């Protein structure tokens, strides 16, 4: 249904945001070295 689609999109967005945050943290850490 519509609600499960919304939940799926939200989960995908959360995963994408977490990956982006992790990548940014890695970049910041490598530049700090």
Swiss-Prot record:
Where does this polypeptide localize? Secreted
| Primary location class | secreted
Gene Ontology cellular-component annotations = extracellular region
Alphabetically ordered keywords of this record: Amidation, Amphibian defense peptide, Antibiotic, Antimicrobial, Secreted
Q: Which GO terms describe its biological process?
A: defense response to bacterium
Q: Leucine amide occurs at which residues? A: 33
Tell me the domain of life: Eukaryota
Kindly state the tissue distribution recorded for this protein. Answer: Expressed by the skin glands.
Name the protein family.
Belongs to the frog skin active peptide (FSAP) family. Dermaseptin subfamily.
The free-text function statement in the UniProt record for this protein reads: Has antiparasitic activity against trypomastigote form of T.cruzi (IC(50)=0.25 uM) in vitro but not against L.infantum. Probably acts by permeabilizing cell membranes. In vitro, shows no cytotoxicity against macrophages. Has antibacterial activity.
- Name the UniProt record assigns to this protein: Dermaseptin-4
Q: Which organism is it from?
A: Pithecopus nordestinus
User: What is the taxonomic lineage of the source species?
Assistant: Eukaryota, Metazoa, Chordata, Craniata, Vertebrata
